Amino acid sequence: MNFDQKGLKKRSITVAYFFEHIQKRFDIKFRRLNELDEQKCRIHERDLHRPGLAIAGFTKLFTYKRVQILGNTETRYLNHLSDEERKTAFANFVSFRMPCIILTSNNKLDQELVDMATGAGIPVFITRCSSTKTIYYITDFLDEEFSLYQQYHGSMIDVYGVGVLLTGKSGLGKSEVALDLIERGHGLVADDVVVVKRKGETKTLVASRNNIIDHFMEIRGLGVVDVRQNFGIRAIRDRKEVQVVVELLEWSKESEYERLGLDQKMVKLLGVDLPLVQLPIFPGKNITAIIEVVALNFLLKHYAGYVPAEALTERIRNVINKERAKAPAPSTSFEEYNDEND
């Protein structure tokens, strides 16, 4: 598997996509105040803007390409102005080509001002949520939409709560191993095509499935398996953080494989370092059980700081030190030295 693939990133999303999907993903509802072709309005930035200064007339540093949030402060400022001042201030505000305007806390906007936004081709939405809650949800949504992402060939499994990305050359049996893990009670996130996203500037990688393939698996010799229908809702996961990468390798006598586990290999995915476990495949090897142990070892190290290889090494070192302490010290007296040289 090529781990060096560069991450991809969306350049923009439509306001129509934003309006539809954010309400599905979060506990927030929006209502349209005007009717426009939202497919033509696009959001290019993940950051939001509170345009208080811009409404007041200072537009020198106005980041108008962002989603504009009008909360209590902005709407009350507009309401305290006279009719002519309000029209002038809002006309100046909507003269900039912004993606959309969102009113929070059910704040009202005069219909005349809404019509001005409609004339400028700017969608206006309203929500009952507070500005703080609205900004939190929208930022989280846009953060994910504009995150780095890449598609990897493999399987993503939730094993004992640990996100394991199973990779390797085609034909080595990744799907069969994943199916065996599902039968043992673990959860399938994705098979064949795994979509991995790096959330914002964090070191967190989140894996999800391809929406077309969904939770179907292709098993050679058997055909297509619907994991959800065959094993029930417990056998699938919507998304999972990638915590360990397991690479299946063809067995080779010439190759040297890790035997103790003291040297932890790492692999970089989308700029994030992850532990890599390479497992050679040969007849009679129970890969499923080994992957379960890989997950348990990760939990031991993550929560208890315990590494079996280091514990065994320390035990051997202690035994050697005890044996050395029991052995009689060699004599180095001056008389014995002279006797030996007479």
Swiss-Prot record:
Pfam families: Hpr_kinase_C, Hpr_kinase_N. HAMAP family: HPr_kinase. GO terms for biological process: regulation of carbohydrate metabolic process. Coiled coil: none annotated. Residues 280-285 are annotated as: Important for the catalytic mechanism of dephosphorylation. It catalyses: [HPr protein]-L-serine + ATP = [HPr protein]-O-phospho-L-serine + ADP + H(+); [HPr protein]-O-phospho-L-serine + phosphate + H(+) = [HPr protein]-L-serine + diphosphate. Homohexamer. Disulfide bonds: none annotated. It comes from the Bacteria. GO terms for molecular function: ATP binding; magnesium ion binding; phosphorelay sensor kinase activity; protein serine/threonine kinase activity; protein serine/threonine/tyrosine kinase activity. The active site is at 153, 174, 192 (proton acceptor), 259. Its EC number is 2.7.11.-, 2.7.4.-. The keyword Chloroplast does not apply. This is HPr kinase/phosphorylase. It is an enzyme of class 2 (transferase). ATP binds at residues 168-175. Transmembrane segments: none annotated.
